[in-house]
Amino acid sequence: MDPTSPKNLLVDPGRAREVLSAFSVDPDRPLLVQVSRFDPWKDPFGVIDAYRIVKAEYPDVQLALVGSIALDDPEGVRLLDDLKGAAGGDPDVCVLSNQDGVHAAEVAAFQQKADVVIQKSVREGFGLTITEGMWKARPVVAGQATGCRLQIEDGRNGYLIASTEECAARIVQILSRPDVGESLGREARETVRRRFLSTTHLARYLSLFAQGPMREPEV
């Protein structure tokens, strides 16, 4: 992950609040965020179901599903429309895309203000949006897909879940115990710093090159 990318830079807290407010999201209420393509493999409908379970215990909770969509992607357009229908007019569910003016800086603001970052993927390679949330020191709740397991050590720097009910339970745990969320977030950021930053890997390559050419083995 490139830490100098606009999506990975720290957003001024006041500006982050303004971004959320511009999309009718209350920055003073709990917020769940999933950033992903509008793709069935990301299980966005499962995220909405988990949100509804959480809302029974935390009526003030909000959900933002944030993604990008291409005009020549009819399946993505249909899924976006279906998601808005699944929200059922709930004013606390926000489904946003680049067509709404959500770009890198806005995505960063949503991730930074999230109380919980969700990545409920059924299938996932290396989840860059997981890393982005971890780098912002947010607690991440993710599915059991292979890429998620490469990034998250369950219970140490995030949570891995196998069902909608487990997803909701972990979210409730984080909302009820802010200290748990803070601890997970700290470990998550440190994990990214050590393992997933492009600058860290570049420094390691430079250190290797500085050692000079490798000697040919003697025969």
Where are these regions (language model features)?
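Short alpha-helical segment that forms part of, or immediately flanks, the ligand-binding pocket
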Residues: 108, 131-135, 146-150, 156
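Short hydrophobic beta-strand element within catalytic cores of glycosyltransferases
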Residues: 130, 139-142, 160
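Conserved acidic donor-binding segment of nucleotide-sugar-dependent glycosyltransferases
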Residues: 154-165, 173-178
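Nucleotide-activated donor-binding/catalytic signature segment of Leloir-type glycosyltransferases, i.e.
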Residues: 67, 71, 76-109
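A short alpha->beta transition loop at the rim of the catalytic pocket in nucleotide-sugar-dependent
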Residues: 115, 137
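Conserved donor-binding/catalytic core segment of Leloir-type glycosyltransferases
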Residues: 21-42, 48, 64
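A short, well-ordered alpha-helix in the C-terminal region of glycosyltransferases
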Residues: 180-195, 201-207, 211
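Aromatic "clamp/platform" in nucleotide-sugar-dependent glycosyltransferases that forms part
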Residues: 122
